[in-house]
Amino acid sequence: MEIGTFPWLTTIILLPIVAALFIPLLPDRDGKGTTIRWYSLIVGLVDFILLVVAFWTSYDFSNPDLQLVESYAWVPQIGLNWSVGADGLSMPLILLTGFISTLAMLAAWPVTFKTRFFYFLMLAMYGGQILVFAVQDLLVFFFAWELELIPVYLLLAIWGGKRRQYAATKFILYTAGSSLFILVASLAMAFSGDVISFDFQTLAAKEYAIGFQLLLYAGFLIAYGVKLPIVPLHTWLPDAHGEATAPVHMLLAGILLKMGGYALFRMNAGMLPEAHARFAPILVLLGVVNILYAALTSFAQRNLKRKIAYSSISHMGFVLIGLGSFTQLGLSGSMLQMVSHGLIGASLFFLVGATYDRTHTLMLDEMGGVGQKMRKMFAMWTTCAMASLALPGMSGFVAELMVFVGFATSDAYGLPFKVVVISLAAIGVILTPIYLLSMLREIFFGPENKTLTEHETLVDAEPREVYIIACLLVPIIGIGLYPKLTTQVYDATLVQLTERLRSAVPVIAQQAEASRDRLSHFPGQAHRQAPPLG
């Protein structure tokens, strides 16, 4: 079979899921799950290598359309198909999923309780998350979205902390409850018009009445806003992070939150552009609320996990502002922020888990003075914190700068609105280094807790932990120094999406029409297209 016709995405999705089914058959000679760990890590690594090969050989950066397409009739009577593919919106997040999931397998090495079931869920989650980003059928997307909740719930409920049952139940109630909006909106879109179809491209090509679009958009926004999360739909996240283990942290922060951002791009902006034009100012304001509220709340937290969790919510606010900017630069910054936060969030939460394994406390008041005994941990914490506070030369700086400049140059909003939004968001940016640097001081240089510093478990980072952080820092710094590494993957798709969104904004459309009219009055200029706006 030729490279171009090989079913790459189906193979990449099904390999970890099928491999998970063989875990119960594996021997466990030492009773510690060593064989199962290595098996799962190798499966994850092989799947990621296949993903990189597919990307390198079959993905064309200059093509804005769907690539690596596979489509098989499943239930043709209702237009249901197994249809997968990748474009600029999904490919960066598919690569991110493979990368973070493989590292999470390695991060899970200390897990010894019910090892078989733990790695079974990890592998099933791996394939399921890629399916969410690759599927091109809205009903299958809903099934994948729902099935993804089951491994997360079990990973929280079985391997979480003292309040794991509460956190897992809250997670499932929030996410499963909000998913009803996806189901209702999906059925309404599919059965609207003469053709019954759940295909993304068919749904995007349909014309919907504006009132109907607004209802669909609101339903999707609630469902995806829970997963992003958007304040005030965020309260499940600090509780989930507060009880999760390190590998589950990495999957939550690195991948799960990006599912909400991706769906807003794909469904809300891509399929409902007229409704997006009306909701965009609300998205921008919600983004500002996310940035400010979560930054202030993080500043007040004394629990290390909850502090980083609120920091994550704050950073995801930039995704909303970029999505509502109506500029290619703003949309590009929003996409880059999702990739950047996936890497930075995974690194910070892994370090939180590694620190807890040594100190057995999450309270900053009980830490202090451990810098002398954990110098490598301090170096890793400091570097990752610098990435989170958007230090120049790291991915977060480029992403946030692109969002700010993209929004500032948008011609969809008046100057007073832009000044207010940028000023308020800038306050959140200023707060970030304050709470992160004070956190580092309290952990490593605060008043020494002799009971803690003299304990035998307080040892420096081991090679496995250094390797995981090094793997995460390479793309963080690489993107920060050369953003085109990532932006070239989705630029062509975002050019197409930006044009579609801008044509739906009355102010921009009127300006474009006026520009064309003015040009038509000049000899030799009538055939020329109006220059890009913003």
Curated annotation (Swiss-Prot):
It is a multi-pass membrane protein. GO terms for cellular component: plasma membrane-derived thylakoid membrane. It is found in: Cellular thylakoid membrane. The keyword Thylakoid applies. Keywords: Membrane, NAD, NADP, Plastoquinone, Quinone, Thylakoid, Translocase, Transmembrane, Transmembrane helix. GO terms for molecular function: NADH dehydrogenase (ubiquinone) activity; ubiquinone binding. It comes from the Bacteria. GO terms for biological process: ATP synthesis coupled electron transport; electron transport coupled proton transport. It catalyses: a plastoquinone + NADH + (n+1) H(+)(in) = a plastoquinol + NAD(+) + n H(+)(out); a plastoquinone + NADPH + (n+1) H(+)(in) = a plastoquinol + NADP(+) + n H(+)(out). The chain crosses the membrane at residues 6-26, 38-58, 93-113, 117-137, 138-158, 171-191, 210-230, 245-265, 279-299, 313-333, 335-355, 377-399, 419-439. Its EC number is 7.1.1.-. The keyword Translocase applies. Disulfide bonds: none annotated. Belongs to the complex I subunit 4 family. NDH-1 shuttles electrons from NAD(P)H, via FMN and iron-sulfur (Fe-S) centers, to quinones in the respiratory chain. The immediate electron acceptor for the enzyme in this species is believed to be plastoquinone. Couples the redox reaction to proton translocation (for every two electrons transferred, four hydrogen ions are translocated across the cytoplasmic membrane), and thus conserves the redox energy in a proton gradient. NCBIfam families: NDH_I_M, PRK02546.1, PRK12561.1. This is NAD(P)H-quinone oxidoreductase chain 4 2.
